[in-house]
């Protein structure tokens, strides 16, 4: 096993080669990575079977689905890499140019960050997404996956590095930390001078640990306590469609709805229909029904478990939905601002003034009017695959694509000027 220190030194030794690589060279490398990923399907599936067998009974079915791979999912990962090839290279982009009175020409240019560390949980697709995005944005990467997905991740990284071996980019620009202990995560948090940026992707426990302990700069990809508010002027059919998609299409992801707020004027009509759609109809179809966590007002219209205070602060990542009835738009916004993780929140309304108030007052990375929160995604936003959804305001916010993985520098051109 290569030590963490050796890995940090290896990636530092080769980072300049990727920081300044041409777009053509990087695109050739990405295509080779995608091809070798598909070619290694058999090996990756064998490794994934080991992880799945070890994880069964230890994590939820929803989380098992995140971990699971088949040939179609591997092909989708490769397709994601190829899509990055089609994206414009951000490195070298001129952001601003100005000329001072003394003749100095100042150019602000986009540059790579350097070496980016990614700590993530049992999500195999993050491995290929992170490798592709960091490479195209001119960065080297150090990956540390969760132990539940280690065999799968190792097989994926092996395939990606084999692809790089056929190009002029050194395979060491992608590093996988082999130690999956908690100590390895803390070592990355303290790796100032080796890592230029650290990005955690996972649950609240992981993200909070990184934010609280890292001395390396961090971009917080926050948890998603995502709200949908059904206003008194909402179209109910539209609302039901949005709720169904936001909650059931993929409940294990961070842009899935966790809390439903309903105006009291709509509760009596929409909540029974919601119960029919999310419970009765799903049972009839052989699908897992939604489990409601209801406040006292909501429980008058639909059956379910009484909500506890913490239910409105929980990212369930499962077929569980907290429901609260509110008396006004202002109460809905106040609730969101008290409980939101500032990820994605939505209003369903036909009232333009209500929509404007909601979008002005809700301070989240993505705020929706009459649309599902499931669109908060790099691919859906036209950014390609993403590094995560940033819920902070500094450097990056929302889906992080290529540009969010860069910095900039000033190039100052003169003709012998000196400062008086």
Swiss-Prot record:
Main enzyme class: oxidoreductase
Keywords: Amino-acid biosynthesis, Cytoplasm, NADP, Oxidoreductase, Proline biosynthesis
Function in brief: Catalyzes the NADPH-dependent reduction of L-glutamate 5-phosphate into L-glutamate 5-semialdehyde and phosphate. The product spontaneously undergoes cyclization to form 1-pyrroline-5-carboxylate.
Cell location: Cytoplasm
GO CC term, one of those recorded: cytoplasm
Family stated for the protein in its record: Belongs to the gamma-glutamyl phosphate reductase family.
Protein name from the UniProt record: Gamma-glutamyl phosphate reductase
Species whose genome carries this gene: Streptococcus pneumoniae (strain CGSP14)
GO MF annotation terms: glutamate-5-semialdehyde dehydrogenase activity; NADP binding
Residues making up the signal peptide according to the UniProt record: none
GO BP of this protein: L-proline biosynthetic process
Predominant cellular place of this UniProt entry's protein: cytoplasm
InterPro entries (alphabetical): Ald_DH/histidinol_DH, Ald_DH_C, Ald_DH_N, Aldehyde_DH_dom, G-glutamylP_reductase_CS, Glu-5-SA_DH, GPR_dom
Enzyme Commission number(s): 1.2.1.41
Pathway(s) of this molecule: Amino-acid biosynthesis; L-proline biosynthesis; L-glutamate 5-semialdehyde from L-glutamate: step 2/2
Catalytic activities: L-glutamate 5-semialdehyde + phosphate + NADP(+) = L-glutamyl 5-phosphate + NADPH + H(+)
Superkingdom as given in the UniProt entry: Bacteria
Gene symbol of the encoding locus: proA
